Amino acid sequence: MAAMAGGLGTLLYAGAARLDFFRVGDGVEVEGNQRITRAEVLMMSGVDVRTNIIAFDTIQAAAAIEKHPWVSRARVYRDLPNRLRIKIEERKPIALLSRDDGLYYVDRAGAVFAQAGGGDDLDYPLITGIKNEGRAAAGLLDRALAMISTIRRNDPIFPRQSLSELHVDRDGEQTLYLVNTPFPLRLGHSRPRQGDIAAVLKQLYRRKVIGITRSVDMEYGRDRVLVRLKTPLV
């Protein structure tokens, strides 16, 4: 009896997989996509107007969609009798990484996932100095992203939009450049808190020397900051 039931189930599946009743036609809903287009999702999933929803491999389709550089996760659901629902979760860049061949988007997890092209949004902090790939470069990138995450926490004097560039030297030292301050802030190998940087900037504004500041060294000494000025104070 069990063998007969199994055989009957196979026959029913095979029959349903050929019925026009289960063809999706244009009944495909795509959700969550902004960067990747609907047409790209459909093409990568392999679904078309002749696709039978019973025979369609939803797991394979999701895996195919996830090969797109901007897609972090894809899920495909059947809505019987003849509709498919595709949910997309796209990567969210937090920085741009400068390489010899161009700029690349980087997400919070440190994945370098897509090259920026003409017309793309470039309003992200720029990470420079990390030229190579591999474990060492990944470690430098992780430290840079941790610093950016710290800086991007809002502060009245230090808004998240203020970060322009974070340069990483070969030995891992970091130098920060802000949008409204033309001088570099050397962070060195340390990871100063956002409040530490903001406190230094507040002092420069309060003493009205922000305009003549040449550089700031946040790692000059233990609990000491070195501020170099373009002109000496009178």
For each of these PLM feature ranges, what is it?
Residues 70-73:
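Glycine-centered tight turns that cap/initiate beta-strands
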Residues 1-27, 39, 43-52, 59-63, ...:
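Charged, solvent-exposed interaction patches on well-folded alpha/beta domains
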